[in-house]
A protein has these predicted regions:
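ATP/NTP-dependent adenylation/nucleotidyl-transfer catalytic domains that generate, transfer
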Residues: 1-231
Length: 231
């Protein structure tokens, strides 16, 4: 319900550039049905992230239904930044069989998109020239699950977030080392906490390409229970 017309236009342009079929399926009827079903149980409680996640799960259910009916494997769109801090809905946008961007941080996704618009790899199956609309790369990222939502409402700016995550994950550094380098202590500590508590989501994420030094899975696995911390 909160998907902007700009995002719909960008999706149409992306499909056109790639030569893909585009179908638009509104989730409003399903959302209204869930609202009615859960209303007696949610009575007296304000709308919050629960309703946001229901939207994502309805999308995941719809996409999986199309995958079942027509056969193609559903790909997830989450990147390493989002999966690191749990900025994804389990059984929602995490639903799928393969995660193409699983080992790419958000800032790297932007750089790869810009590169692909300029280059066509020799073995690529896609078209030459631009394949990603510039506005998709340049506009503020948003899950669009509530009015005027931006990723930075919940997370540090991606350049800062990725710097922290690369140090903690790829380099196996510590929060104390980052703080000693001059980064804001509250921000670093919060990102580290999110990294730990999102472990249960990552365990249920689909497999994907390994590109970096340490991907989530065999390279980096931590206990889920008992509020585990390394220090």
């Amino acid at each position: 319900p909160y998907t902007s017309q700009e995002s719909l236009d960008d999706a149409a342009e992306c499909a056109r550039l790639l030569g893909c079929r585009l179908d638009t399926v509104g989730i409003e009827p399903a959302m209204q049905a869930f609202d009615a079903m859960l209303k007696p149980l949610f009575e007296g409680r304000a709308r919050d992230i629960t309703e946001e996640n229901i939207q994502s799960r309805i999308r995941g259910l719809t996409l999986m239904a199309l995958s079942n009916k027509y056969g193609p494997m559903l790909l997830t769109t989450g990147n390493k930044s989002e999966m690191s801090v749990g900025y994804a809905t389990i059984y929602g946008d995490m639903a799928g069989g393969y995660s193409v961007l699983k080992d790419l941080y958000k800032t790297t996704v932007f750089r790869v998109s810009e590169w692909r618009n300029r280059q066509r790899p020799r073995l690529a199956l896609g078209p030459a020239g631009q394949v990603m609309p510039e506005r998709v790369i340049s506009k503020p990222p948003s899950a669009e699950l509530r009015p005027d939502q931006k990723d930075e409402d919940s997370l540090p700016p991606y350049p800062l977030l990725d710097r922290i995550l690369m140090a903690l994950v790829e380099e196996e550094g510590s929060a104390a080392e980052l703080i000693a380098q001059g980064l804001d202590a509250a921000t670093v500590t919060r990102v580290e906490r999110l990294l730990y508590i999102a472990e249960y989501k990552r365990r249920q994420a689909p497999p994907g390409v390994k590109i970096g030094r340490r991907n989530f899975g065999r390279d980096r696995r931590y206990p889920i229970s008992n509020a585990f911390r390394t220090a």
